Design a protein with these regions (language model features):
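Amphipathic alpha-helices of TPR/Sel1-like and other helical repeat/solenoid scaffolds
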Residues: 1-10, 37-53, 76-83
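Short, charge-rich amphipathic alpha-helical segments embedded
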Residues: 3-30, 166-169
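Short alpha-helical scaffold segments that flank and stabilize functional sites
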Residues: 7, 17, 22, 52, ...
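Generic preference for flexible, low-structure residues
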Residues: 20, 30, 35-37, 65, ...
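Hydrophobic face of amphipathic alpha-helices that form TPR/SEL1-like repeat modules
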Residues: 21-24, 63-67, 100-101
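Short coil/turn connectors between adjacent alpha-helices in alpha-solenoid helical repeat scaffolds
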Residues: 24-39, 70-74, 105-108
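Alpha-helical protein-protein interaction modules
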Residues: 43, 47, 59, 63, ...
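Residue-level detector of flexible, active-site-proximal loop/helix-junction positions
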Residues: 56
Length: 220
């Protein structure tokens, strides 16, 4: 991306993708200690991308994701709505907005968008199966409180990502199905011996900290 920017300093998407890449690296622990001030760098890239082309769909989609990472939910929704107005049926922005609504106390609306994204493009960009999209719906249905539907989507998934697994386990606990919860916890720990579900949930950018804490309690 540095080379892309050097080759074309007026390419707004290059700045947006660079900001997104740094954010993903921070979120996954890849960039610890490698950049002096990564958060300031992200903000600089966001500002530059927006200045260069405020009506680029891809830029607005990425700016939605980046602001969600920084928990600036108002800005995330602003850019997400702009992206939707430019390309209302792109499953990537439907997925981004669906996730945003789920973590900002609008889970019913969020689940509808996540299901629509799954139906439009089950695999998603760069994926080889539908597991990511289905897992996102499982998370949304758990937050919505539709625990039975979360379990129904679990029947469709191949390999669960950790947040989907946490959503399944929390749904089982919420339904009082303690034995099944214990079995799923055991499977998760065997598959991910160095991973803690509480740490996975901690990385979710819930607007309501109470919802995050309740989620953690249900997976213990």
């Amino acid at each position: 991306l540095d080379k892309s920017i050097a080759a074309d300093p007026h390419n707004a998407q290059a700045y947006a993708w660079r900001a997104c890449s740094i954010g993903q690296g921070l979120g996954n622990g890849y960039l610890e200690g490698e950049m002096e001030n990564p958060f300031e760098e992200i903000k600089t890239m966001i500002q530059k991308a927006s200045e260069l082309d405020e009506n680029d769909f891809e830029c607005n989609r990425l700016l939605c994701e980046i602001n969600k990472f920084f928990e600036d939910f108002e800005q995330a929704e602003y850019y997400g709505n702009k992206a939707c107005s430019l390309n209302p049926n792109d499953p990537r922005i439907l997925s981004a907005m669906g996730d945003l609504f789920v973590i900002t106390n609008r889970a019913e609306e969020g689940v509808n968008l996540l299901v629509k994204a799954y139906e439009l493009d089950p695999m998603g960009l760069g994926a080889s199966n539908a597991d990511k999209r289905i897992g996102d719906v499982m998370f949304g249905t758990y937050v919505k409180g539709d625990y039975d539907l979360c379990l129904e989507y679990d029947k469709k998934i191949g390999k669960k990502h950790p947040l989907a697994w946490a959503s399944l386990i929390a749904s089982l606990e919420s339904l009082g199905r303690s034995q099944e919860k214990s079995e799923e916890l055991k499977k998760f720990k065997e598959a991910n011996p160095e991973m803690l579900l509480e740490e996975i949930i901690e990385k979710v950018h819930f607007e309501d900290l109470g919802a995050k804490n309740k989620f953690k309690e249900l997976v213990i």
